[in-house]
């Protein structure tokens, strides 16, 4: 409660709230403390520990890591249910504070309910599973330990370079104990996220490399959001005439009508941006960890003279693939690098080529996403219908499956900050839980979640959460009969359809799920539609609704936009089918272009 943060010059709570599911491991002591302080620190009831934590993570991303939710559970399954969410936060460099209950520090009642026992090490508990997926972990076995532990956790979560989840496991017997804490520990403290400046030498070296390039591109990542560097990115691109591509996490850091906007790059990118990547002799990566879907598993950059400049607040990310590192805040670094470049700019023909290819690709996407006479619509047709009837400020949310790549091609940003995804861990069911957190952070905006039937069936309880907390979502359920995108990969690798689509699984009692009725049972308004025209009308009704609105529609399981980048996904070394042989051939072609460093 005493922890505050400056956001745009205004003092705000660092911790806006707690998501909690109480059990014997946290209800009697921590639960009572939360009840007694609910006006200053509200607690929101969860319905699944993973989901409530994902909601907190979605909130933190939408708030650009400036506010942090707490997630608390009991010991045992409640705690381990949050492990997946911790992985989401860890891989996406997002803050959340986990406070799981733990076993007794004094061990007198061992084994307690839900305790896992390690015969060779009684100090290990289920909460040790948090260690690989948190930036900071501690177990409180004495009450005075929190004097050092909590400030350390906070500084980790607020550190722009080391940001990630923190876990402080609270032993049950210690939660209720007293200690004569110093008054200073409870005094208000105001935080501000630091903006480290880059080293002058690194700026100089980066500027020299850029000046020697002829066809540079920018790769804009999620760090541009967290640094609030969208204006600086725009100014840099215009001044130095450099096309801007975007990662999935950096999508909507630039608007579609910007003179240097190029679109999505890499495995989910368009042919236009991947053509730029093949030809570029230098990429300026800004705030991106350069994941495989961004780089085409490092096979996208085919120019033998290719060089990489990486602007990143994290030393670890900035130095990847022998890049010329610029270790610093994106906003500050772009300004200083621009000063070092002076009046230098790339040739006019390069960005003209980028815009020409973008126009051609957009026309192809528009044609694919337009309504047609086919009986079952494709993903892009569904997304196109929603996009056509949406407002520029509406926020699209995706996470797993084929919808992520289709949305970034169709949902071309008309305003900044209008696309949110979870593509670090690609966690199924984040589409609903994360969308709820994004809505809580943006109560005045429409939040539209695109989700497949596979993700929906995996976890959907936050439809109910959104209803009872008055956080309206629009959820578009695309039912293509199973895990269609992995079925696509299975076929691409030369395999036979097996255990992905429902029809190719062991399902003798197969029935269709009525997603609309299921959502309705949780208090949402809902309807099933059978065509794109019906979808458009349903979406208009959803926009007018004051409660969560779920629209389900059958979608094509085999129809996708064409991919144009390599992805290093394993292939059988010894083929067993003719299809395997073709897959191996394509795999070897891609591997032959993969860079060993830069």
Where are these regions (language model features)?
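Short, internal active-site loops enriched in acidic
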Residues: 172-175, 403, 557
């Amino acid at each position: 409660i005493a922890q505050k943060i400056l956001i745009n010059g205004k003092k705000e709570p660092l911790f806006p709230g707690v998501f909690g599911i109480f059990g014997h491991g946290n209800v009697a002591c921590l639960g009572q403390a939360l009840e007694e302080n609910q006006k200053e620190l509200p607690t929101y009831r969860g319905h699944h520990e993973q989901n409530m934590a994902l909601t907190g993570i979605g909130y933190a991303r939408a708030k650009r890591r400036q506010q942090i939710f707490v997630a608390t559970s009991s010991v045992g399954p409640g705690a381990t249910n949050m492990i997946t969410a911790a992985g989401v936060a860890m891989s996406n460099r997002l803050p959340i504070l986990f406070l799981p209950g733990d076993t007794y520090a004094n061990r007198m009642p061992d084994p307690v309910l839900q305790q896992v026992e390690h015969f060779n090490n009684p100090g290990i508990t289920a909460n040790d599973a948090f260690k690989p997926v948190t930036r900071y972990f501690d177990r409180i076995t004495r009450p005075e330990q929190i004097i050092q532990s909590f400030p350390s956790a906070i500084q980790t979560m607020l550190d722009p370079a080391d940001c990630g989840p923190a876990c402080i496991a609270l032993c049950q017997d210690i939660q209720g104990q007293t200690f004569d804490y110093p008054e200073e520990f409870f005094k208000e403290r105001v935080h501000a996220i630091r903006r480290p400046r880059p080293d002058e030498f690194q700026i100089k070296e980066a500027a020299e490399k850029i000046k020697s390039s002829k066809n540079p591109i920018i790769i804009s990542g999620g760090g541009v959001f967290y640094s609030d560097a969208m204006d600086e990115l725009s100014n840099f691109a215009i001044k130095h005439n450099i096309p801007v591509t975007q990662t999935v996490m950096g999508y909507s850091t630039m608007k579609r009508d910007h003179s240097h906007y190029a679109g999505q790059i890499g495995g989910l990118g368009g042919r236009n941006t991947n053509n730029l990547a093949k030809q570029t002799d230098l990429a300026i990566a800004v705030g991106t960890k350069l994941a495989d879907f961004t780089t085409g598993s490092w096979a996208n950059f085919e120019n033998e003279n290719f060089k990489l400049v990486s602007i990143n607040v994290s030393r670890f990310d900035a130095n990847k693939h022998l890049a010329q590192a610029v270790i610093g805040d994106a906003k500050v670094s772009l300004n200083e690098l621009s000063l070092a470049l002076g009046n230098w700019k790339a040739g006019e023909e390069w960005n003209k080529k980028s815009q020409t290819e973008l126009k051609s690709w957009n026309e192809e996407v528009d044609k694919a996403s337009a309504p047609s006479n086919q009986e079952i619509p494709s993903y892009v047709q569904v997304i196109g219908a929603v996009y056509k009837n949406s407002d520029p400020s509406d926020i699209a949310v995706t996470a797993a499956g084929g919808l992520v790549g289709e949305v970034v091609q169709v949902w071309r940003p008309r305003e900044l900050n209008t696309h949110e995804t979870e593509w670090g861990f690609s966690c199924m069911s984040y589409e609903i839980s994360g969308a709820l957190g994004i809505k809580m952070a943006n109560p005045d905006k429409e939040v539209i979640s695109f989700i497949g039937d596979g993700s929906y069936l995996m976890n959907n309880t936050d439809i109910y959460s959104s209803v009872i907390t008055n956080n309206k979502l629009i959820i578009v359920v695309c039912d293509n009969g199973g895990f269609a995108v992995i079925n696509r990969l299975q076929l691409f690798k030369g395999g036979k359809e097996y255990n992905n689509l429902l029809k190719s699984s062991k399902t003798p009692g197969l029935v269709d799920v009525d997603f609309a009725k299921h959502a309705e049972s949780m208090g949402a308004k809902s309807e099933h539609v059978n065509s794109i025209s019906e979808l458009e009308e349903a979406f208009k009704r959803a926009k007018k609704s004051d409660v969560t609105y779920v629209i389900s529609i059958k979608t094509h399981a085999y129809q996708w936009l064409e991919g144009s980048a390599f992805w290093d996904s394993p292939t059988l070394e010894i083929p067993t089918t003719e299809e395997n042989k073709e897959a191996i051939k394509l795999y070897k072609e891609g591997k032959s272009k993969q860079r060993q460093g830069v």
